[in-house]
Amino acid sequence: MADSVTFRIFRGEPDKDGVPFGKMVDYKVDLDEGMVVLDVVHRIQAEHAPDLACRWNCKAGKCGSCSAEVNGKPRLMCMTRMEDILAETPENEPILVKPMQAFPLTKDLVTDTSWAYQKDQKIKPINGPEEPDWVFHQEEADRLQEFRSCIECMLCVNTCHVLREHQMYDEFAGPRFFVRLASLEMHPLDNESRIPEIKDDFGIGYCNITRCCTEVCPAGIQITDNAIIPLKERVVTEYYDPLIDPIKTAKNLTSGVLSYFTEDFSKGSDPGNKKKAKSTFEEERSRAEEARKMDSERTEKARKRFRSE
């Protein structure tokens, strides 16, 4: 490991109109064996810039507080080892540390993530059995355990291009929100219906399955495959499955709502786009029917066991 390194850190805060204002400042820091990025930031605070704002708490990858962009990638600073950063940084180039770009700036490396918690208030709470003891087996809980491991670091939100690049904060609730919602919607004893809100209010159709949120999740949650796609399939089952309600399906399709789910395929002048869109919808419908059957079977088994025990 190098004896010293140059960190180029964003320093600034919003102006009176709330517009971020600041600059990148270089700090040369001595390194010790085994340091992580957060250690270096703390050393900069101790030796160069005591007013450098940085949010952190556990330094163990459990609280999600120290999220930032290191060399352009969303990461937890406490879990990002300096030897890995040095290996990816070109020789004689500084290491870049910036705040998350998808959230309003508070100061330096600290951002305001209150938007995400305001979104949470729109989720309907769980609606389970009236009996005081909720009984279901571990195999049914395994699906939820993954979602409960979220540390709310907001890295998935920061890397989501719908929010980061297109600023669709009113239309799209974001990947972290759907993880939280999935933990309730997929509970084996939950009877609440959130499908209309998922479709209309939370904008799940804006996600086009790039899986960038999954790639940056430090908890290893399969956000796209295990949360977002199953929720999309439930929407398709509810609104577009002719096996469930042919009349409603025909009405939804003829009203043009299908474009909500096939937006990427319907753009442009390629004559094959319509065929692609139809093929995509058929695949969605097939997966939705299979998911509906599996969910119904799991729910019915859980309820039978609950009543018998």
Predicted regions span which residues?
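Short structural boundary motif marking the start of a folded domain
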Residues: 2-7
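Well-ordered beta-strand positions in beta-sheet-rich domains
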Residues: 24-28, 77, 94, 161
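Short polar catalytic/cofactor-binding loops
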Residues: 9-15
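Short, structured protein-protein interaction patches enriched in aromatics and acidic/basic residues
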Residues: 58-67
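Short, contiguous acidic and Ser/Thr-rich linear segments
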Residues: 22-36
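Short strand-turn-strand beta-turns centered on an Asx-Gly dipeptide
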Residues: 10, 69-73
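Ferredoxin-type iron-sulfur electron-transfer modules in oxidoreductases and energy-metabolism complexes
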Residues: 35-47, 97-309
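Active-site phosphate-binding and catalytic loops of NTP-dependent enzymes
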Residues: 49-55
